Amino acid sequence: MARSTRAKQRLRKGRKKVNQDHLSVKKLTVAAVLMAMNIIMSISALSIPVPGGHMYLNDLIIVTAAILLEPFYALLVGGVGAFIGDMLFYPAPMFVSLVSHGLQALVISLFVHRWMKSRPVPASVIGAAVGLVISVTGYTLGRAYIYSTPAYAAAKFPFQILQTLVGSALALLLCWKCGVVKLYEREFKRG
């Protein structure tokens, strides 16, 4: 009798481990797809020309990833995805992108998944607002340093705010009004 009970317990532990591994693979796959989308959004052909450069829609993907994914995965999608995109298409600000978008995604995800877990919609809005400040500040300081001209950074400043604001607003609408969060959660509850 004791042997069969132990065998059942081992079997349950084994099933639980398989399910956890399956979830990890699924989360990694979602993160990889979002990272690929982030890289693709770095193409200048998909951007809007503005004085001082281009306005990209990366923030839509970064904020969406941060709302859906745990902080580690969000950091990878935001920071590493933007870094690779810049490295492939315009390498000068790639380290600025790594830090700015990485911190932006990390902070949003921490608000949603750790600090205000019981209230995800307000957490997303607050996180996106804080992420906007991080991204805009990081890019403004980074551009001033990289290009050695604060005037260049100042010229791009309002468009950087607009880029992050539009991307964040679209991500919030996509996640909460269009049901992406519910779809994502339903898929992961199913295992």
Residue ranges, per PLM feature:
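Loop-helix junctions at membrane interfaces
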Residues: 1-191
